[in-house]
Amino acid sequence: MKLVLKISGKFFDEENIENFISLRNTIKNIVNEGHRLAIVSGGGSTARKYIKIGRELGVNEAHLDLLGIWASRLNAYLLTFILSDLSYMKVPENLEEFIEKWESEKVVITGGFQPGQSTATVAALVSEAIAADYLILATNVDGVYDKDPRYNKDAKLLSKLNTETLKKILETSQSVKAGTYELLDPLAIKIIERSKIKVIVMNYKRLNKILDIIHGKDIGSIIEPM
Ligand code: U5P
């Protein structure tokens, strides 16, 4: 299989060494089983910190996005160095560079590409370019809920849903300003739909279960494109 793994910036914010060890072991197992893997890292609180300071000082949205992109590349380099025996040692900065590095057969790890989108769009573009079997969004919740689980105790996890349902759920939190994206930005959803990319949302604390979740044997959400 060809897999794209998008690691939420929150993974980096937690600074949990066990999570990093588990990620490294999972990636080694996936590669040893003969699958190909690309990883996209989010910008997390480092991106938000720089964007917040810049915004308060009147920096424009394009420049704020660039700050976010560089923060996501910093996270991408952390993963690159942690996985140096498997990974391509340069973080690609656009889709052409990514495609070129992918030919190396190594795990290619990337952050942001260009302003106006989030790293979820990068993950969707990369998935499209390599015809990935699955795009896996590893975040700090177990999957997609019918309501925001942070504010609704009765929120239910949806094990299967389509992009139409997802768009309705995300409607309340959608924004295109730097640093404000939640899970998937509108452009990422458009790309997922136009190329019918299958998306899995799962908790990064259960990364060792990726293959089980893909096969519907463990907790997570599978999003079918409409
Ligand atoms: N960003 C971009 N383009 C990209 C990736 C990220 O402009 O291709 C910026 C956005 O401002 C985004 C921030 O909110 O970097 C951090 O990425 P993310 O963690 O929100 O995905």
Curated annotation (Swiss-Prot):
Chain coiled-coil ranges: none
Chain positions recorded as ATP binding sites: 6-10, 44, 48, 139-140, 145, 148
Cytoplasm found in the keyword field: yes
Subcellular location: Cytoplasm
Activity regulation summary: Inhibited by UTP.
SUPFAM superfamilies: Carbamate kinase-like
Residues bound to UMP: 43, 65, 113-119
Keywords: ATP-binding, Cytoplasm, Kinase, Nucleotide-binding, Pyrimidine biosynthesis, Transferase
NCBIfam families: pyrH_arch (TIGR02076)
Protein name (database record): Uridylate kinase
Lineage of origin: Archaea, Thermoproteota, Thermoprotei, Sulfolobales, Sulfolobaceae
